[in-house]
């Protein structure tokens, strides 16, 4: 595997794509949907000149761009292949997603326990969406849709006849009242969640000591990403952690446009091990290194 491919940017990209949905935008491209936007450096001729020749058929049936902000081409994974943060991308029409039985989807992707599956909305979201409400219940989404429908009736239109049963002023008041009720409910939920967080602070602090240093760094980084509208590939590094929360032997930085990625070896506390070039162009093998 090329040192640029285990790009840790794939953690943020895959997680955001799976759980939040926004696409990744290159520099100059417009953001679609909500969520952070990753602005990558352009893949110009200088960056492409540093790429190795792409694999050829029959070993490779489809070429895709390497994960993160890399510019080189690599083989795409096929449907059913194992995937995750440190793997190549899935092929066209596929998406790397955790298995339905996974209790911690993001952690599964970080540990490479995902699989390439059809990217249709039904297959991706069925395991994460709540069960459909009974006919007598109305969800907030339905209320928003109904409110929007009522509000659209208020707007004059030459192509629509206003129903005499719905007076424009009365309909507009219903929209306002529903909006105020939703805001009040949201405030109540937020207040109750804050109270619960305060009560559980001591227990969370106690559990935090059980996590390894890599796990704590990774969670701090991901929590920080939630509040960013624009992500800079230069300033974010998501560590490679083992199941116990300690650092894996091999850590990598992703490619950044014309700048190639690199890897280095560390002990389980994240300290670089001597004798390994941290910015070498060749792949770094840490399998024989004992992380003590």
UniProtKB/Swiss-Prot annotation:
Segments of this protein annotated with the region Disordered: 127-161, 191-211
Protein keywords: Apoptosis, Disulfide bond, Glycoprotein, Growth factor binding, Nucleus, Phosphoprotein, Secreted, Signal
Compartment(s) of residence: Secreted; Nucleus
Domain called Thyroglobulin type-1: residue spans: 211-286
Compositionally biased spans, kind Polar residues: 129-139, 192-203
Positions of modified residues (Phosphoserine): 149, 202
Cystine pairings recorded for this chain: 40-69, 43-71, 51-72, 60-75, 83-96, 90-116, 214-241, 252-263, 265-286
Stated role: Multifunctional protein that plays a critical role in regulating the availability of IGFs such as IGF1 and IGF2 to their receptors and thereby regulates IGF-mediated cellular processes including proliferation, differentiation, and apoptosis in a cell-type specific manner. Also exhibits IGF-independent antiproliferative and apoptotic effects mediated by its receptor TMEM219/IGFBP-3R. Inhibits the positive effect of humanin on insulin sensitivity. Promotes testicular germ cell apoptosis.
InterPro entries xref list: Growth_fac_rcpt_cys_sf, IGFBP-3, IGFBP-like, IGFBP_1-6_chordata, Insulin_GF-bd_Cys-rich_CS, Thyroglobulin_1, Thyroglobulin_1_sf
PROSITE patterns per record: IGFBP_N_1, IGFBP_N_2, THYROGLOBULIN_1_1, THYROGLOBULIN_1_2
Gene field: Igfbp3
The organism's taxonomic lineage, starting at the top: Eukaryota, Metazoa, Chordata, Craniata, Vertebrata
Post-translational modification summary for this protein: Phosphorylated by FAM20C in the extracellular medium. Phosphorylated by CK2; resulting in decreased nuclear localization.
Protein name as catalogued: Insulin-like growth factor-binding protein 3
Glycosylation, residue list: 118, 124, 137, 200
């Amino acid at each position: 595997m090329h040192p640029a491919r285990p790009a840790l940017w794939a953690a943020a990209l895959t997680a955001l794509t799976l759980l939040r949905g926004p696409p990744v935008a290159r520099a100059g491209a417009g953001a679609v949907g909500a969520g952070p936007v990753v602005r990558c450096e352009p893949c110009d001729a200088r960056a492409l000149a540093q790429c190795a020749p792409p694999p050829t058929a029959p070993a490779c049936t489809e070429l895709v761009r390497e994960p993160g902000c890399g510019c080189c081409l690599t083989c795409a994974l096929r449907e059913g292949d194992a995937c995750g943060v440190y793997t190549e991308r899935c092929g066209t029409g596929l998406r790397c997603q955790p298995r339905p039985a996974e209790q911690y989807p993001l952690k599964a992707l970080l540990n490479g326990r995902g699989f390439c599956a059809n990217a249709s909305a039904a297959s991706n979201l069925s395991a994460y969406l709540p069960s459909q409400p009974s006919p007598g219940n109305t969800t907030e989404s339905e209320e928003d849709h109904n409110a929007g429908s009522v509000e659209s009736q208020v707007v004059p239109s030459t192509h629509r006849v206003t129903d005499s049963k719905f007076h424009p002023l009365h309909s507009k008041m219903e929209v306002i009242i529903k909006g105020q009720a939703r805001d009040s409910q949201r405030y109540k939920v937020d207040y109750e969640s804050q109270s619960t967080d305060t009560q559980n602070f001591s227990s969370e602090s106690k559990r935090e000591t059980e996590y390894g240093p890599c796990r704590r760094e990774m969670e701090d980084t991901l929590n920080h990403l939630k509040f960013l509208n624009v992500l800079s590939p230069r300033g974010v590094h998501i560590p490679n952690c083992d199941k116990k929360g300690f650092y894996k032997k091999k850590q990598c930085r992703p490619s950044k446009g014309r700048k190639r990625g690199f890897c280095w070896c560390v002990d389980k506390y994240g300290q670089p091990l001597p004798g390994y070039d941290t910015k070498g162009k060749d792949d770094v093998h840490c399998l024989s290194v004992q992380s003590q």
